[in-house]
Amino acid sequence: MIDALTVCFEVTDRYHYDRICELDFGQTYDMYEFQLMRVEGRYYNNVYTIIYMDGDSQVDFGQLKFNIGKVANPNNLHDNGNPKVWISLNNQSLYSNDQYNLGFIATKLGLEPHNITTLDLCLDTPYNVSKPLRQLIKNKAVTTILNGTRVKDRDEDRAEISYTTSGSLNKDNKYMTVNVKQRNAIKDKSRGVTITTYDKLAEIVNSSGKEYILKFYGNPTKLFRTEVHLNNAEIKDYLDSRGLYFNYYMIDEALLENMFFYHLNSVIRFKYGKQDIVWEQLLGRAS
């Protein structure tokens, strides 16, 4: 399951691009099937909300953004000189068929896909994954393989692994989130793979309010998430090393699941004697 997606595009036809560049904040550019409304952005000088109508309902599909201006040495052009444009899908679009409108919207705007900038993959289960994961890490009889290396000194600090607990005043460890990162991602998740396991139902009820996710699953009473955050470098390396092609407009669930488990196991896995303990087992995909 995709939980976050940002795709970098190349402007191959500047007609609409040049016109939306002229919009002031709050102004709208009408593409008939959808609209672009310019809004304030944090890192990009040009940010537009993509809106279209579904019957009587207005759908916030995502954001189109370009012209990075608030970081050092921004790179806003492809090697051929064409402008870079990014589209980030609204989270709710990923839990409906709205995501399949990406190809139509990009084509209408004169954009060609270039690469995936960020991709969050997740698998939701009716059982808690954080607890058995922590138990495996703490079990002295189990060898932890962290970022491809067997951990020999169990007393050495491991900044790659962190635990966060929350809950009530009387029970502050009611919920536990486990984060495991590649070393390059410890300070900046844009530089490596990050794994997170947590109570998704509690997160929705207590903070995010993403009720559409619960509706997507039929309003379960228990929902736990395992999530992998990937950046362009990891995705490109994975695809190139296997001679695979990522279809930006038709999601290949088998490819995504293989990519998901590959990166989970590349960051952390376990061995008990001669037995491998991998994420496919933790998440119920293998016995």
Predicted features along the sequence, with ranges:
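Structured, helix-rich domain cores that form ligand/interaction pockets
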Residues: 1-286
